[in-house]
Amino acid sequence: MTHPTELPLSPLSALQFYATAPYPCSYLDGRVARSQVATPSHLINSDIYTELVKAGFRRSGVFTYRPYCDGCRACVPVRVPVDAFAPSRTQRRMWKRHRTLVATVSPLHYDEEHYALYMRYQSARHAGGGMDRDSRDQYEQFLLQSRINSRLVEFRDLDAPGGEPGKLRMVSMIDILGDGLSSVYTFFEPDDQHTSYGTYNILWQIEQAKSLGLPYVYLGYWIRESPKMAYKANFHPLEGLIDGRWKILDPERIDLPPVDAALARAPLPGGHSGSG
């Protein structure tokens, strides 16, 4: 993604943008990254956040950012145009396999069972990355703080005999934007092998967007060099934000320069960047 020279005057004119100091990239080992941050957070409502997402921003709690790395365009914002989406045979099979899961949509809230699942997921999938040691406060700041129209979705098995709730399998946080749903974060039962819960969750979001009359599901960033991001390229068609324009993305032929570690470590220019 290229560095922006300007942002639309409205409705973003009240915001300020600044570049962070360099920090270790969380997606590509050995890389140095930085972000462009939108502030102040209390002015970022659902309408403004919709415009920011269209410009490649994401959020973590109330922290709204996009990649702003020197010499690197590895992070490509991607979205699925839901009316044109055509599931693959594997995706259709996955949808059928998990059709008995019961999805419950609610406002963001803390639940001890959710937090326990989150910790099991982090310990199994991201051990040693820091998030496997998240306290309850850190969990809440990361996933349960939002100033926009956000929802928590839990996926359970069918209720057990006697009315007991079915086993919790997955929890997903989503934002409802003016032009789509934005997938914030998903965690699931790590002991369930070969379930592709993450793929099922995106398929569910696509169906929800259709039912709400929303044209897109935003999937965050796709990174060609990151195996963890490979699944996003399996949704067709897929649009990517390239050089400031959303266009159909061909992951096999995308014209991006290779990630250059030397350039990624280049000295940062002084002062604010972007529009701030």
Swiss-Prot record:
UniProt-listed InterPro entries: Acyl_CoA_acyltransferase, Asp_Glu_LeuTrfase, N-end_Aminoacyl_Trfase, N-end_Aminoacyl_Trfase_C, N-end_Aminoacyl_Trfase_N
Location relative to the cell: Cytoplasm
Main location: cytoplasm
A single GO molecular function term of this UniProt record: leucyl-tRNA--protein transferase activity
Keywords: Acyltransferase, Cytoplasm, Transferase
Cellular compartments per GO CC: cytoplasm
Keyword Acyltransferase recorded: yes
Reactions it catalyzes: N-terminal L-glutamyl-[protein] + L-leucyl-tRNA(Leu) = N-terminal L-leucyl-L-glutamyl-[protein] + tRNA(Leu) + H(+); N-terminal L-aspartyl-[protein] + L-leucyl-tRNA(Leu) = N-terminal L-leucyl-L-aspartyl-[protein] + tRNA(Leu) + H(+)
Matches recorded under Pfam families: ATE_C, ATE_N
E.C. numbers: 2.3.2.29
Annotated family: Belongs to the R-transferase family. Bpt subfamily.
Matching NCBIfam families: PRK01305.1-1, PRK01305.1-3, PRK01305.2-3
The protein's name in its UniProt record: Aspartate/glutamate leucyltransferase
Species per Swiss-Prot/TrEMBL record: Burkholderia lata (strain ATCC 17760 / DSM 23089 / LMG 22485 / NCIMB 9086 / R18194 / 383)
This protein's encoding gene: bpt
